[in-house]
Structures are given as structure tokens and as C-alpha cells.
């Protein structure tokens, strides 16, 4: 049983916008919330974990940092999440000597309230089903599947896993049908 601190480092925004239309302020928002926030949360947690003899950090990244998706132009979002993925690998090396593991889950399209932050409910109901065919395993992912991946990475069953970015994507990174 895990007997040390665990941080689920989950903060983000999502607002697809073409690269040529992203303002400096919008870009900064992606970096501040997705990357900078996770960087300093991980730093604060790691300091506390060192005092306790170890710990686990599981971050949320995104499939969009692994594979561009033309239907949702998201260069700023993707770049910030690519930073999270790089942070994961770097911290895995830096923190391993302190018995701190860090991993990231990279979900594809998961049906969460985030879509309601830039579309009204009618648009969400119309648009989300169009992504069902995007995943080789079928419909958009349920949040519970991402939660189960996070729970696994935080558990003792994953005690020898660190620095990993785990796609939770219904098979998207394997290829497209």
C-alpha cells in the first residue's frame, strides 16, 4: 500500500484556435495554467515528498502534445502540454534519487466539462460525437478510464515506472483506421 504523498497534478484549459489567431495573452494563459502551474505544484510537492522519504506525482498531459489533430487547431495548447511531457521525463531523472516517481497520462478526446468552456451545450452535443470515429477503440473516452490510469500510476503496482507519458487514447497513437 502506498504510504507516501501523492500529487495528482491536473490543471488545464482547452480552447482550439488556429496558430495565426492566438494572441500573446492567450498563449501565456496556456503556458501559465498548463505548464507553469504544474511545474511549481510539482516543485512544492517534491520538496515535501523529499522530507517524507518519497512520493508519487501523476500529471495530466494531452494526446495533442504527441499527435497534431487537424480538426482542433491547438498549437498553443499542444506546446504547453509538450512542455509537461518534457517536464515529466526530466523530473523522473532528477527526483528518482529521492524515491519520487513522476508520470503523465495523455488523454485523447474524453467527455469532460472543458468543452463547455468554449462551446454552448448544443454545440458540445453536436460536435463531440463527431470525434467517436477518431479512436480505433470506438467512442470518446469516459473520464473514469483516465482516472483508472492515474490510479494505477500512483499505486505500488507501478513502483518501477517513472518518466512515462501514458497515452489514454483509445488506440489513437497506435494508428488511425
How would you label these PLM feature ranges?
Residues 135-146, 157:
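A conserved structural motif in NAD(P)-dependent oxidoreductases
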Residues 150-151, 162-177:
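Short C-terminal tail/terminal secondary-structure segment
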Residues 62:
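Residue(s) in the substrate-gating loop at a strand-loop-helix junction
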Residues 42, 80, 88:
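Active-site helix of classical SDR
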Residues 66, 102, 107-117:
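Short, flexible catalytic-loop segment of classical short-chain dehydrogenase/reductase
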Residues 47, 93-97, 159:
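Alpha-helical segment proximal to the catalytic Tyr-Lys
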Residues 18-19, 26-31, 127, 131:
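Substrate-binding pocket helix/loop in short-chain dehydrogenase/reductase
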Amino acid at each position: 500500500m502506498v504510504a507516501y504523498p501523492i500529487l495528482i497534478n491536473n490543471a488545464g484549459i482547452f480552447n482550439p484556435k488556429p496558430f495565426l489567431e492566438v494572441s500573446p495573452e492567450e498563449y501565456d494563459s496556456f503556458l501559465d495554467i498548463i505548464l507553469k502551474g504544474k511545474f511549481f505544484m510539482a516543485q512544492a510537492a517534491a520538496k515535501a515528498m523529499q522530507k517524507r522519504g518519497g512520493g508519487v506525482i501523476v500529471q495530466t498531459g494531452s494526446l495533442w502534445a504527441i499527435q497534431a489533430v487537424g480538426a482542433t487547431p491547438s498549437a498553443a495548447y499542444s506546446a504547453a502540454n509538450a512542455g509537461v511531457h518534457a517536464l515529466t521525463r526530466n523530473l523522473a531523472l532528477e527526483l528518482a534519487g529521492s524515491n519520487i516517481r513522476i508520470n503523465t497520462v495523455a488523454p485523447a478526446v474524453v467527455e469532460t466539462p472543458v468543452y463547455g468552456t468554449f462551446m454552448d451545450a448544443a454545440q458540445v452535443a453536436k460536435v463531440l460525437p463527431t470525434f467517436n470515429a477518431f479512436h480505433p477503440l470506438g467512442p470518446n473516452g469516459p473520464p473514469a478510464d483516465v482516472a483508472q490510469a492515474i490510479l494505477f500510476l500512483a499505486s505500488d503496482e507501478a513502483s518501477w515506472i517513472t518518466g512515462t507519458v501514458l497515452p489514454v487514447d483509445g488506440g489513437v497513437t497506435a494508428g488511425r483506421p
